Amino acid sequence: MQQWLEIGKVVAAQGLRGEVRVQPATDFAERLTRPGARLVGRSLDDGRVFRLQSGRAIPGKDLFVCRFEGVEERNAAEKLVGSTLWIGAAERPVLAAGEFWLPDLMGVRVFRQDTGEAIGEVSDMTRAGNDLLVIRLSGGKTVMVPFVHALVPVVDLEAGRIEVVAIPGLLDPEAAEADEA
């Protein structure tokens, strides 16, 4: 079964010739500019495959203008507003060593490197100065750990294991709550 990755949302029709404005949900602009198959729909179940003919960034805005085969006029484009765009997972660019796809990290078990104790699992990632892994601890609370090699030296996706260096306060949700107060 084909796996799909979300790459954007159709937010508006653009002009009279069937183009749409897309809010990107990807760091790879070529996913919205390079021709090829894209799944477009309100959900994966009702999505329809369209061929992206062309796409371009709108200077100064976090938007792209895309043209799909078979969408030739504004009324057809307006029917796509609110839809999500997906690309086949097999079309993901090759990453350098030490780089990972967020969907591949989700749900991976996290362990303290010093004791080997399982402490929780990755539930999300957020961006600040650098990426922060959001780890749902076994007790239900969450902590954020900078996703840098010094603190997260082991990421073994095949084994489903991430190891974290437990410096004082890093894995203590109460310390994080005290900092927020």
From Swiss-Prot:
Keyword match Transferase: no
Gene3D superfamilies named among the record's database cross-references: PRC-barrel domain, RimM
Keywords: Chaperone, Cytoplasm, Ribosome biogenesis, rRNA processing
Lineage: Bacteria, Bacillati, Cyanobacteriota, Cyanophyceae, Gloeobacterales
Domain notes: The PRC barrel domain binds ribosomal protein uS19.
Compartments, record wording: Cytoplasm
All residue ranges annotated as the PRC barrel domain in the record: 97-170
Gene name tied to this protein: rimM
Protein name: Ribosome maturation factor RimM
HAMAP family assigned: Ribosome_mat_RimM
Family from the record: Belongs to the RimM family.
